[in-house]
């Protein structure tokens, strides 16, 4: 498999997972706002912190009311992580590798993108219906991917992107709950506190499974233990880490035991730390510090994966840069650019890879709409390392 193809598959699924999470976060928060007692703090700003976009939001919306938060998270073109932009970037990455993904996958992500971009009927719906339709569209894409894509490297890199994004968002929303939603001790244990813990479980899509597996009162320790350490819930951190380790082993092609490299060491050590600990130990040592350390490990895993599989082998270590950085070109992009230099432009180059942290201009509807849905040609790039 080409590095460029693996890169696109990875980011398609990260962005679809991110969009699905945002739609669920906003949908749950809107429902929770109706149940909050009069005069209570609105549950909106923590969503900005969970997505790591507080500085940008404060610049764009100094007042920070609920309508502005929803607009920023869902439709704002200036927010590179807004729901609409995530779907647009996922669709553009899918367009570039249409000869690799299945027709059903392309049709689903393309339909979802254009229903958001051009459908007046879509935005005329109540907000809850809009978010529910987007969430279901993302989940349908997961189902189509699992049902139609062969269990080769294409599927493994798709799953890898989804799992890393899922683990990251689970830790972020849990961290926000512990240290941002309830700054005053008098709120702990009250009605608002219980509502917030229920909303946290719903944000993670975990409310019913928590009720079935734990069969106990909703209290902070039990919720944290379920989201972090449960081995069978598909959105728990431990579950994601186990599948990440398995996926990396399959992708590496290592069949014989040997000295593990940096990527295998980090994935194994991270999984071990979260498999052989208890929630009491995590809380005693500082849950916030443990989550911070885990997020750092997840970022390091992403960087190592990008350096091994998404950067051409011919590059020297000094040439390595953060994956999909805005404005940068990979070896395959430069090769494609040279091949197409004599051709008249007809939209974005087929081998252009959308950045992981794109600028607002790169994500504008006009720029995304300019892309023609034609199958890209595979350029000759370095194969994945085995």
Report each predicted region and the residues it spans.
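Alpha-helical transmembrane segments and their helix-helix packing motifs
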Residues: 1-327, 346-359, 371, 376-386
